[in-house]
Amino acid sequence: MTTGKFIVLEGIEGAGKTTARDSIVRALHAHGIHDIVFTREPGGTPLAEKLRQLIKHETEEPVTDKAELLMLYAARIQLVENVIKPALAQGKWVIGDRHDMSSQAYQGGGRQLDQHLLHTLKQTILGEFEPDLTLYLDIDPVLGLSRAKGRGALDRIEQQNLDFFHRTRQRYQELVRHNPKAVTIDASQTMSKVAEDVESAIETWLTTR
């Protein structure tokens, strides 16, 4: 049986990951790929969803930056081992709303946690496991947060100050520049143009991989 592929969408709040996901699905369907699993981080398993609530929402005590990071990795490995890897082994394609690059950008850039700590956690928890393709939706935080606010109340992460998101975006851009399996999409464009660019990126990847 042919192993499936793992495609991940990354970007700050308001970048349009839902629109991009729909575009990926259309492109895959056009190539006869219909057995698709959708995941999100943090979340995707019963335990990971409980951790998501702790990470995304205010609790009776402040969540320290390192505690947040460790909860994210706990949720991630549950999802990878219990959902993503089994799906790929069955030949299914997985489209993920966030993966490890989010922690590298949000916790490494936004929270300014030690890069060595992040690298050690990634190597220890995930080893060589990584997406086959990452689409990074790049958008200015001012525009992205404006879009996010239009969706309703912001969660604990979304309520961080603007500097946090500028640092997160900068770290994303650095990570993508050094990742040959990552493609940047200009998410400041209209949703229809973003969708077009995502489909084009998937088409190019499918025909050249």
From Swiss-Prot:
Binding-site residues for ATP, renumbered to this chain: 11-18
Lineage top rank: taxon: Bacteria
Biological process terms in GO annotation: dTDP biosynthetic process; dTTP biosynthetic process; dUDP biosynthetic process
A molecular function (GO) term: dTMP kinase activity
Keyword annotations of the record: ATP-binding, Kinase, Nucleotide biosynthesis, Nucleotide-binding, Transferase
Pfam families assigned to the protein according to its UniProt record, in alphabetical order: Thymidylate_kin
Catalysed reaction, written as an equation: dTMP + ATP = dTDP + ADP
SUPFAM superfamilies the UniProt entry points to: P-loop containing nucleoside triphosphate hydrolases
Record-listed E.C. numbers: 2.7.4.9
Protein purpose: Phosphorylation of dTMP to form dTDP in both de novo and salvage pathways of dTTP synthesis.
Family, per entry: Belongs to the thymidylate kinase family.
PANTHER family reported in the protein's UniProt record: THYMIDYLATE KINASE, UMP-CMP KINASE 2, MITOCHONDRIAL
Protein name according to UniProt: Thymidylate kinase
